[in-house]
């Protein structure tokens, strides 16, 4: 499955700038959006409003939306790994887990009733997937993806 994706950072750009960027990248054939909740420092309601607006617009353009999260995000927004409804409410098609879970949590999340994709960051530790598989996840909802965002030292060494 070959798809082109783009990264957006709502804490670094205005909603209007992001919408313009998504329109341009949509015209160029991109169909996947990677959005980041890791560095957002706003109240939950403000996050929900902003991300919902951006993600709704992205869906209108035909994008699939994946939101990057970590255990810290779950804690700060009071989200349980057994209840991922917050992410569905903001229009995410899936969440990308950077690190910090044991394997059991990721496995449980793959059975979420919101039908969200659970994507693992394969750039951190390729053995993470083995640990998750030990807990018998729903393999149809478990994806692996390497870093593709343009931050120095965020990709794999050659």
Label every PLM stretch briefly.
Residues 1-19, 68-79:
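Active-site mouth loops of central-metabolism enzymes
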Residues 1-4, 29-31, 57-65, 91-93, ...:
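Short, well-ordered coil/turn segments that N-cap beta-strands
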Residues 12-13, 40-44, 71-77, 103, ...:
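Short, small-residue-enriched loops and turns at beta-alpha junctions
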Residues 13-26, 76-86, 125-132:
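Short, acidic/polar
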Residues 27, 31-53:
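Glycine-rich, proline-tolerant flexible connector loops at the mouths of alpha/beta enzymes
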Residues 33-34, 95-96, 141-144:
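Conserved beta-strand positions in the central sheet of alpha/beta enzyme cores
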Residues 44-70, 108-122, 158:
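Alpha-helix-loop-beta-strand connector modules within alpha/beta enzyme cores
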Residues 101, 105-108, 114-158:
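Catalytic alpha/beta core domains of metabolic enzymes, predominantly
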